[in-house]
Amino acid sequence: MDFNTVSSFQVDCFLWHIRKRFADNELGDAPFLDRLRRDQKSLRGRGSTLGLNIETATLAGKQIVEWILKEESNEALKMTIASVPSSRYLADMTLEEMSRDWFMLMPKQKVAGSLYIRMDQAIMEKNIILKANFSVIFDRLETLILLRAFTEEGAIVGEISPLPSLPGHTDEDVKNAVEVLIGGLEWNGNTVRVSENLQRFAWRSRNENGRPSLPPEQKWKVARTIGSEI
């Protein structure tokens, strides 16, 4: 097993432990708690894939971090922080909307890269809006935390979430997954809109209906893919 893969997992486990202690003292805000919950699932998936015990990895990660801090000067730390671009967290959904349980009458699901797409194909002829919580860097979507599709009544009818066992995705991965979800919902006569944040940071262009602009042949391809695969 690659040494860097193991040590990276160990450090991630220890840093998650520190963040959890911080949250336990009621010091974390909503974006912080969102990321903490998602990262916990990701670490469990990575641990299962690597065959590593999380508690043991956390202790090993502590030793690595302590060694780094012992060698790190305050001046070097300042230079490192200054050189790293900062990301922003954008939230279309409240914490309640993100954590709410939902069920599907006609469940359909699909894995697209490292993203998991779910939708209820029993939903027909509804007005639906896609909301997402994600981070942005250089005015582009960096990391999707969670995307959900809501009806006007507030019911959840679709979702895109990162797979814990396959961390890492690009803004193009998210765009492709959203197009699959939109195609599946529109297949049943629903009208789908995308939140302003998603329009701005995931797509550079949009149409008057508030959804990403797709060429006709791509719309047809997406719809056909949904009908046969999802």
Swiss-Prot record:
Location of region: CPSF4-binding: 180-215
Region (PABPN1-binding): 223-230
Assembly with partners or alone: Homodimer. Interacts with host TRIM25 (via coiled coil); this interaction specifically inhibits TRIM25 multimerization and TRIM25-mediated RIGI CARD ubiquitination. Interacts with human EIF2AK2/PKR, CPSF4, IVNS1ABP and PABPN1.
Keywords on record: Eukaryotic host gene expression shutoff by virus, Host cytoplasm, Host gene expression shutoff by virus, Host mRNA suppression by virus, Host nucleus, Host-virus interaction, Inhibition of host innate immune response by virus, Inhibition of host interferon signaling pathway by virus, Inhibition of host PKR by virus, Inhibition of host pre-mRNA processing by virus, Inhibition of host RIG-I by virus, Inhibition of host RLR pathway by virus, Interferon antiviral system evasion, RNA-binding, Ubl conjugation, Viral immunoevasion
Coiled-coil residues: none
Motif Nuclear export signal, chain ranges: 137-146
Molecular function GO terms recorded: protein serine/threonine kinase inhibitor activity; RNA binding
UniProt superkingdom: Viruses
Annotated spans, RNA-binding and homodimerization: 1-73
Protein name, UniProt field: Non-structural protein 1
Record flagged with keyword rRNA-binding: no
Function: Inhibits post-transcriptional processing of cellular pre-mRNA, by binding and inhibiting two cellular proteins that are required for the 3'-end processing of cellular pre-mRNAs: the 30 kDa cleavage and polyadenylation specificity factor/CPSF4 and the poly(A)-binding protein 2/PABPN1. In turn, unprocessed 3' end pre-mRNAs accumulate in the host nucleus and are no longer exported to the cytoplasm. Cellular protein synthesis is thereby shut off very early after virus infection.
Lineage, broadest ranks: Viruses, Riboviria, Orthornavirae, Negarnaviricota, Polyploviricotina
Swiss-Prot/TrEMBL domain comment: The dsRNA-binding region is required for suppression of RNA silencing.
Disulfide bonds: none
HAMAP family registered for this protein in UniProt: INFV_NS1 (MF_04066)
